[in-house]
A protein has these predicted regions:
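Walker A/P-loop NTP-binding motif of AAA+ ATPase domains
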Residues: 9, 73-291, 303
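Short, flexible/disordered secondary-structure transition segments
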Residues: 28, 32, 36, 41-45, ...
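Exposed alpha-helical structural elements
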Residues: 54, 68, 72-73, 283, ...
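C-terminal engagement/docking regions of AAA+ P-loop ATPases
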Residues: 2-8, 286-298, 308-375
Length: 375
């Protein structure tokens, strides 16, 4: 009888032990699932894995090891082979393109030529500035394409996080990932919105992020062999923090195109399109005073609709049409009569930056290399 009671107690103990073990295992699973859903970088990590596989395949090396923060930044890595912009597809700016090739692209493509001494080496910071629509972002993409460097497009929205301390870790991930993928270009468009002048009214998180960015930037500038470059673009160079300007020793003004450059832009835009052979590009360019490269692209897009409209009108009238006619010079001139250029924005840019004592606007036409003058 006693033995039976003892066996019953032992069985009950084993059952309770198994129940507790099952409960603990279930609790761990629930906790693990909950933590996975709380991870702000979970979806970004999945997307980044595909990017890493693609980059590893192009570079011909095994998949790189990255942490969760680098996975988030990897989502903004662009394979240079997938960039459809090159110097040949950018009209005008010939002198600047030549300077960028010598100072930026060549050291990234042929590092062995710049490995002797301290005077030569990859540029660590380059600034492209000028009015809106003049092709700064296109130039940045073309640099990545021509150099074969991976293009890390840094967006401030991706660096901000609701989790304390994550912003600094994401900034650190930008540079650590660039090191692993070098040659690499870290591109910051509208850099004034991220690295503008520091003010007492700035949020503490933004200030800490700027400080972390500059500290890490200083770290790789001391490494002469690192093929990592920060490329920034802005419409407001006078708004940049002076500490940032010191880290961007090579600065290029991408100004409004002149008549010859406007004609070149028109020819590049219309290359490969169905156009009449007798278009006088120089004459059309003379009518486009104050137009940026972006304006000229929109001009051609609007003009391309005229042949389509005429074709549809013919079809509505019951007439047989073989296809839209070629785009003509008259189409371009018709659009010019009603189009709106961004010259106002360009004028605002000139006025704003001429008021800043730190930026001189009087430059020789052949002075393609513009140094940021800080007083």
């Amino acid at each position: 009888m006693v033995r039976g009671m003892g066996g019953s107690s032992e069985t009950k103990f084993v059952q309770e032990l198994l129940l507790y073990a099952a409960s603990a295992a279930l609790s761990c699973l629930v906790l693990f699932a909950g933590l996975r859903h709380l991870d702000p970088n979970r979806e970004s990590s999945k997307k980044a894995l595909e990017h890493k596989k693609e980059i590893a395949k192009r570079l011909g090396r095994p998949l790189i090891q990255t942490n969760a923060y680098e996975d988030v930044i990897a989502c903004d890595v662009i394979n240079p082979d997938h960039i459809d912009v090159e110097f040949g597809s950018i009209g005008g700016l010939e002198t600047i393109k030549q300077a960028l090739y010598e100072l930026v692209i060549l050291p990234l493509r042929r590092p062995e030529l710049f490995s002797h001494g301290k005077l030569l080496g990859p540029q660590k910071g380059v600034l492209l500035y000028g009015p809106p629509g003049t092709g700064k972002t296109m130039l940045a993409k073309a640099i990545a394409r021509e150099s074969g460097a991976v293009f890390i497009n840094v967006r401030i929205s991706n660096l901000m996080s609701k989790w304390f301390g994550d912003a600094q870790k994401l900034v650190a991930a930008v540079f650590s990932l660039a090191y692993k993928l070098q040659p690499a270009i870290i591109f910051i468009d509208e850099v004034d919105s991220f690295l503008g002048q520091r003010r007492t009214t700035d949020h503490e998180a933004l200030t800490n992020m700027k400080t972390e960015f500059m500290a890490l930037w200083d770290g790789f500038t001391t490494d002469q062999n690192a093929r990592v470059m920060v490329l920034a673009a802005t419409n407001r160079p006078s708004e940049l923090d002076e500490a940032i300007l010191r880290r961007l020793p090579q600065a290029f003004e991408i100004g409004m195109p002149d008549r010859r450059e406007r004609a070149e832009i028109l020819m590049v835009v219309l290359k490969g399109e169905k156009v009449e052979d007798n278009i006088d590009y120089d004459h059309v360019a003379s009518l486009c005073e104050g137009y940026t490269g972006s304006d000229l692209l929109e001009l051609c897009k609007k003009a391309a609709y005229f042949p389509i409209r005429e074709l549809l009108d013919e079809e509505r009238k019951g007439k047989q049409a073989t296809g839209p006619r070629p785009l003509s010079q008259f189409d371009l001139e018709k659009v010019l009569a009603t189009s709106r250029k961004t010259g106002i924005a360009a004028t605002e840019y000139t006025t704003l930056n001429s008021q800043s004592s730190g930026w001189s606007r009087n430059r020789e036409p052949d002075d393609y290399q513009v140094q940021a003058a800080i007083e």
